[in-house]
């Protein structure tokens, strides 16, 4: 219900969803919690939280570096502890996890979804799992009332987009471009055709990700028919550039989010 409530409220105010991505435990668990608190206080719509992994193939150098920083002290137990703490801090904000398949399968699919539910997680997106393998997780997701998110990529066929639109719950992660994550100066591709196709199959909101780093990108995304954006690399870069000054880091995150959602 949290995603539904969020999108309904945004629609009422004619606003786009702004969802930040950060890696849990980057640069450490204490500061990671402060970063998430700052994001919530700054007015983000929902959270997309990454689980650190040693080979994050869908990510560019900025987010890869955040995985490596977090991996110095990361564990699944600590990740779940932090998620519980975040949910305890705010009961209403939707929390999504972005994970790589290996982490989930080595933990045990059903156990992972059960634990995610217990921590107050609303959705799971598996970055490197093709749609064809969806049956491996969908039953556990449904059993534990976790919304499974799928990715709509620029080179997907109409049939694939129909599958993505039909099976995605909460929202559809729509790629602004092929390749890996990373902040861009411009949105290279017009995703309006993909979004239009998705909306013929389902009313599930489409969020645009990959390369979102400026206010004008949100305006562009709105023009393409997107219901919101997911912004990762630009935020993670602020963390990377201010590792030695926590106060400055949190202030800059607050300023960045404020500029994006104003």
Swiss-Prot record:
Its EC number is 4.2.1.20. One of its GO terms (molecular function) is tryptophan synthase activity. It catalyses: (1S,2R)-1-C-(indol-3-yl)glycerol 3-phosphate + L-serine = D-glyceraldehyde 3-phosphate + L-tryptophan + H2O. This is Tryptophan synthase alpha chain. Belongs to the TrpA family. Transmembrane segments: none annotated. Gene3D superfamilies: Aldolase class I. It comes from the Bacteria. It is an enzyme of class 4 (lyase). Pfam families: Trp_syntA. Keywords: Amino-acid biosynthesis, Aromatic amino acid biosynthesis, Lyase, Tryptophan biosynthesis.
């Amino acid at each position: 219900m949290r995603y539904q409530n969020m999108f309904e409220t945004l629609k009422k105010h004619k606003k786009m969803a702004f969802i930040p991505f950060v890696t849990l435990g980057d640069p450490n668990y204490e500061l990671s919690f402060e970063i998430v608190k700052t994001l919530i206080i700054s007015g983000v719509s929902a959270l997309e939280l990454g689980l650190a992994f040693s080979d994050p193939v869908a990510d560019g150098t900025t987010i890869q570096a955040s995985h490596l920083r977090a991996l110095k002290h990361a564990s699944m137990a600590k990740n779940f502890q932090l998620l519980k703490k975040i949910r305890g801090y705010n009961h209403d904000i939707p929390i999504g996890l972005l994970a790589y398949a290996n982490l989930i399968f080595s933990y045990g699919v059903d156990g992972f979804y059960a634990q995610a539910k217990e921590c107050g997680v609303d959705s799971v997106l598996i970055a490197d799992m093709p749609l064809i393998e969806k049956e491996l997780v969908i039953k556990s997701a449904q059993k534990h009332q976790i919304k499974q998110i799928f990715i709509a990529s620029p080179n997907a066929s109409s049939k694939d987009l129909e599958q993505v639109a039909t099976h995605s719950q909460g929202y559809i992660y729509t790629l602004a471009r092929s390749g890996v994550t990373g902040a861009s100066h411009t949105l290279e591709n017009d995703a309006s055709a993909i979004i239009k196709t998705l909306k013929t199959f389902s009313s599930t909101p489409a969020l645009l990700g990959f390369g979102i780093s400026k206010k004008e990108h949100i305006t562009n995304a709105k023009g393409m028919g997107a219901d919101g954006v997911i912004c990762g690399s630009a935020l993670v870069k602020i963390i990377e550039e201010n590792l030695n000054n926590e106060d400055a880091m949190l202030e800059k995150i607050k300023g960045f989010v404020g500029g994006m959602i104003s």
